[in-house]
């Protein structure tokens, strides 16, 4: 004898009910359904049924004619009984408590296997519970009913009628319950004022459970308590809206003439409420699905050709799929896209992850950091005198310094720079923990992914084979490391990134030059046994310190030269600055005539004495031309301190250490070495005496 199964949801209750009518599905009417519900006040409810509309697809249709035929899907009728506005209070109490002893349904209904979007379900919490194997649903229902009875007896006045303190204790849930944690985080923003309850929905639009929230004021208090109980559950999911949980359903038509097999493996999900749907487990290379590229692991299979998998058991769905694949002709697959295209597991539940608010300021700063909109490296308020050109020179000459502008990656780029880009979070390379022989490899990559990334993101590779050779070179240079230290590169192996700091010892200032410029061409330091009075002029003119740095301090009682020079220095330091500035020696006059070629401007200089270090730097002609005498300039500083050195480009007196090789002026030094030394001086922030590369 034919029979019809009717599955109906009572108002706010989470567990649906199942009844069987001894009537054929095509002849069952609303009156037949109401006769089964004779122990319920059916006049107090509105009846909604799952129906199919040509324009909108699956909808909820209200039927109030007792003689109307009920819409049926696969031999089942799905209905929702919603308490009508203005219904008597007995209807609500009977609707929630009279059928608590009915057993739950045996078939899958409203779980994750249902192809309806989440907005179709009036009970979002119920539909979400089918996604995992949590067993706390029944205990949650019993706790809520017990709490409702306790509230009816003794509930004190509370803000918005919502308790904020002992939510976990009242629910009887452990402190680490994900749903209660999210509820406590979001409860302050999930409720509205209690006085505006009559015509206002208390739930967000994403849950769409506000149909029955408008009741007469006579029973508003009792209904508000029940509504708050449901809101506790709904607020746990209020952060998962339609934008993150709605099913993106696509239909893919595959031409099986070009490919010999479909190329997918499917898995079925089941829980204590029945089967939960068919999912794409993995995709095999060379198949029709892999060639199309739109279907990914984790997608839910809803329909194959004209056969709908809705409310179909997993065994039946697998049998139907095998029959269709064995036939010839194109195959159309209708799938619901998964929430995460690259899940760590095929069934990642979004509500298991905590939802945090977004800080716009942190978002913008992070975006600016990744796009390169950063302040200049190493700048400070006191170094504003350094121009952009010198700052760029510093950045380009010091290895490892961040570049001001992001340059495209090519095969000629530094390998360490390419590795740094590969390790960025948004580089496109999948870096995650992987399992190999029951060993967890942290932050590992697959060799094939590395080759694909290099071939896609680095310019200059004509073939993928060249990118593979480059990856092998990265392994040899230590930028990639195998788990067991294999030296041959394989695309099937897992690799981790090596320590970039291990290569810093081999870096020097001339890392970008080649040939003879890699060798030091400056004068070497003298032998330690050779006396070298540093009071002489420097062989090179180094730029002075920025204005923010104090002048170099010279101890008045310390001598760099011989004993006689030290006595002169001591006497000079005790005398006034004007006396010291007037000391001149015949040797200095000869050097001036020789170095300047008889220039008149050079004779106006005040040069440090050869016997005592009375001043560290040359004074420019511009200062003397303003009418300031050497006496007044020297007296402007304290005795024993060298005069302040302004930024100037005047050449120093050419001189070298005794016994050393001849030295050159700065103009005679090759340009690549000059820029490197000058940028090094700016980086150090203080004038240096001599700098020699240690090869």
Curated annotation (Swiss-Prot):
Endpoints of the signal sequence: none
Residues covered by the PDZ domain: 251-323
Record keywords, A-Z: Cell membrane, Cytoplasm, Cytoplasmic vesicle, Developmental protein, Membrane, Phosphoprotein, Ubl conjugation, Wnt signaling pathway
Domain of life: Eukaryota
Post-translational modification comment from the UniProt entry: Ubiquitinated; undergoes both 'Lys-48'-linked ubiquitination, leading to its subsequent degradation by the ubiquitin-proteasome pathway, and 'Lys-63'-linked ubiquitination. The interaction with INVS is required for ubiquitination. Deubiquitinated by CYLD, which acts on 'Lys-63'-linked ubiquitin chains.
Segments of skewed composition (Basic and acidic residues): 152-171
Location of the DEP domain: 425-499
Annotated localization: Cell membrane; Cytoplasm, Cytosol; Cytoplasmic vesicle
GO CC annotations, alphabetized: axon; clathrin-coated vesicle; cytoplasm; cytoplasmic vesicle; cytosol; dendrite; dendritic spine; glutamatergic synapse
Chief localisation class: membrane
PROSITE patterns the UniProt entry points to: DEP, DIX, PDZ
Alphabetical list of InterPro entries matching this protein: DEP_dom, Dishevelled_C-dom, Dishevelled_fam, Dishevelled_protein_dom, DIX, DIX_dom_sf, Dsh/Dvl-rel, PDZ
Domain DIX: 1-85
GO biological process: axon extension; axon guidance; axonogenesis; canonical Wnt signaling pathway; cochlea morphogenesis; collateral sprouting; convergent extension involved in neural plate elongation; convergent extension involved in organogenesis
Comment block on domains: The DIX domain promotes homooligomerization. The DEP domain mediates interaction with the cell membrane.
Family: Belongs to the DSH family.
Protein name stated in the entry: Segment polarity protein dishevelled homolog DVL-1
Native species: Rattus norvegicus
